[in-house]
């Protein structure tokens, strides 16, 4: 029930945006609006997320909390199960 209401409301909002853009003189308005709505904010990015899966060797260390995998040669999470 909640999902169907959310999808219906989302559909109505998108229909409104589409109708407004078709009446608008600017043809790029929907793209600008949607890109501003879904733009990723750099403040929410965590530095350590970028380290997971990065290529490494023992000379080039990983971020804190990650270690260089001996087998795969990329940064993995450090934990008690790791050697």
Curated annotation (Swiss-Prot):
Annotated Gene Ontology cellular component terms: extracellular region
Molecular function per GO: carbohydrate binding; ion channel inhibitor activity; toxin activity
Propeptide feature: residues: 22-49
InterPro entries with a match to the protein in the record: Huwentoxin-1, Huwentoxin_CS1
Pfam families per the UniProt record, alphabetical: Toxin_12
Subcellular location per the Swiss-Prot or TrEMBL entry: Secreted
PROSITE patterns tied to this protein: HWTX_1
Main subcellular location of this protein, as a coarse class: secreted
Disulfide partners: 51-63, 56-68, 62-75
Tissue specificity note: Expressed by the venom gland.
Keywords: Cleavage on pair of basic residues, Disulfide bond, Knottin, Lectin, Secreted, Signal, Toxin
Domains (record comment): The presence of a 'disulfide through disulfide knot' structurally defines this protein as a knottin.
Entry function: Agglutinates erythrocytes.
UniProt protein name: U5-theraphotoxin-Hs1a 4
Organism listed in the record: Cyriopagopus schmidti (Chinese bird spider)
């Amino acid at each position: 029930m909640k999902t169907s209401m959310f999808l219906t409301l989302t559909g109505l909002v998108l229909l409104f945006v589409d109708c407004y853009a078709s009446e608008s003189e600017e043809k790029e308005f929907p793209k600008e609006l949607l890109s501003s709505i879904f733009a990723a904010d750099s403040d929410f990015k965590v530095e350590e997320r970028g380290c997971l899966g990065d290529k490494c060797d023992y000379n080039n260390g990983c971020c804190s909390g990650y270690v260089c995998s001996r087998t795969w040669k990329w940064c993995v999470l450090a934990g008690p199960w790791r050697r």
